[in-house]
Amino acid sequence: MRTIFANFALLLLLSAGCKKGTEKIRLNVPETDPNAPAATWREHWFEHVQVVKNVAYTKEVALYYDDDMPRDITWPLRKAEEIWKYTKVAYAPFKGTDKRLYVVLHYGKYGGGHPYTYFDDGHDNRTGIDIGSNNSWRDSSNWNLDVLTHEIGHIVEGGFKGVKESPAFLIWGDSKWMEIYNYDVYKKLGWDKEAERVMKDMETASDNFPRPGTRWFKDWFYPIYSQYGETAVLNSFFTLLAEHFPTKAHAYGLEYTRRMNMGEFIHFWSGAAKHDLAELATTAFGPNDRNGAAWGPQLVKAKTDFPNIKY
């Protein structure tokens, strides 16, 4: 998968069930609604070449389907709106002029998904997600819901706070931040069964970076989340990045100038938690980064380079 700030390979393997929406989908009638989004949108990115149709919209979300998507599948509008509204408050500010989330869904093509933001000329400076699946979209839980949420989380990572890019992407990869983001969204929206499903799946989940057997959710993100403020600590990490990590001017705001190293990552998360997380990092990750370099000296230097990160 590709995005405005990295190549994403969706790694979501979650499962359960949920009721389907039954409301009648509202057609886009732009001639009678001056605030309606465009009735069609011609894709011109990667291998995407479809003319997708706006099948429904609200103030918060514009939903586009390709010609193979059944029009009676309506839950994505409802779920995306709830997630997007929550996310814009929880991780504020979102500085895009157009506050709508543009959700493009495909059936039978373009497996997986990618996000895009208003920083991206290649997606006409809209903010949204584009997802394809070879399986039915009728289930409003499991992979269908998780990938929708996952891609919105990448917008937080690479396009909130008025800054483009994701300094931590090479450290946590595609899905590690998404796991705690998805869990938080489900919990805070009162989707208890979905949150429980994520928690259950994360009990046995592990990765091979920065070392084999690393349990990102269980040993790193969830301890931070549960002990140091839940949503507030997640948001604080991105706020501190926007305030202190190097940026340069961009046509639509600012852009981070580089990725961060593991020592900086631990330093900024410690600042977000207002607690020294070096011991937790050693337990979760071991003493080295994913390239085999000791992160201890990196952390020492990070404290010198970013002295205003306090904990």
Model-derived features with residue positions:
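Positively charged n-region of N-terminal signal peptides that target proteins for export
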Residues: 1-6
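C-terminal motif of bacterial Sec signal peptides marking the signal peptidase cleavage site
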Residues: 15-17
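Bacterial signal peptide processing site
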Residues: 19-21
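Zn2+-dependent metallopeptidase catalytic core
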Residues: 29-122, 145
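Second-shell loop/turn segments in exported
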Residues: 63-76, 133-143, 163-169, 206-210, ...
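Zinc-dependent metallopeptidase catalytic helix centered on the HExxH motif
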Residues: 122-200
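Short helix/loop segments within enzyme catalytic domains
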Residues: 184-208, 212, 225-243
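Beta/coil-rich, acidic/histidine-enriched accessory regions frequently appended to metallopeptidases
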Residues: 252-311
